[in-house]
């Protein structure tokens, strides 16, 4: 299934990279990922304070979907290396002092949560189950795998798998759309299936290769 995208006009001018230019901002714009999209669409229709883990291969779209417009939350992005047992209180204080629009949720996004130490996970878990964070907080942790996460941490969160299985054809379709939108000549169209396969279903890597092809055309 190809993404429902509206592309800006271009002619081989790349003031920003293709991966940035075509980064999806709405749930419907993501390539593949039908199950995560359905889950997030339901959540966006009636959001509530909760904790989630988005897990799957690097580059599949976990962080971008967490920031989708439909979620309607004020995002606060925390790299996992800053989320350790020693500074959990500092993270909590920052969340309380962030500017918040009335009625909006606060999104605390922790990337690469599987890199957190067990002590950091349990320290954060103790705060998730208390009133430490603002009551309107949504936590989304991204991870390449669940293997490095504590069982107690997993039991407190809802896991959503971002599987790249079967995405190769969808990525190839996206690349063809972008090639045409960027003014690539039909007779010079590269093998999009090959690019998709070589990227191992990493959309960002596929777009980097496509950008190289466009510059060489």
Model segments located where?
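P-loop/Walker A NTP-binding region and its immediately flanking N-terminal helices
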Residues: 1-170, 174-180, 187-197, 205-214
């Amino acid at each position: 299934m190809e993404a429902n995208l509206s592309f800006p006009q271009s002619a081989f001018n790349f003031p920003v990279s293709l991966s940035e230019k075509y980064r999806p901002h709405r749930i419907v714009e993501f390539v593949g990922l039908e199950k995560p999209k359905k889950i997030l669409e339901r959540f966006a229709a009636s959001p509530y304070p909760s904790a989630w883990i988005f897990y799957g291969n690097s580059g599949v779209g976990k962080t971008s979907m967490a920031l989708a417009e439909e979620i309607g939350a004020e995002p606060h992005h925390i790299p996992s290396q800053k989320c350790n047992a020693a500074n959990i209180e500092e993270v909590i204080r920052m969340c309380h002092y962030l500017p918040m629009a009335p009625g909006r949720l606060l999104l605390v996004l922790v990337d690469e949560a599987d890199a957190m130490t067990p002590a950091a996970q349990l320290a954060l878990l103790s705060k998730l189950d208390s009133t430490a964070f603002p009551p309107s907080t949504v936590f989304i942790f991204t991870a390449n795998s669940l293997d490095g996460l504590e069982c107690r941490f997993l039991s407190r969160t809802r896991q959503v798998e971002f599987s790249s299985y079967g995405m190769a054809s969808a990525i190839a379709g996206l690349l063809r759309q972008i090639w045409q939108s960027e003014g690539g000549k039909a007779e010079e169209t590269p093998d999009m299936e090959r690019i998709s396969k070589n990227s191992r279903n990493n959309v960002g890597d596929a777009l980097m290769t496509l950008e190289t092809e466009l510059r060489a055309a």
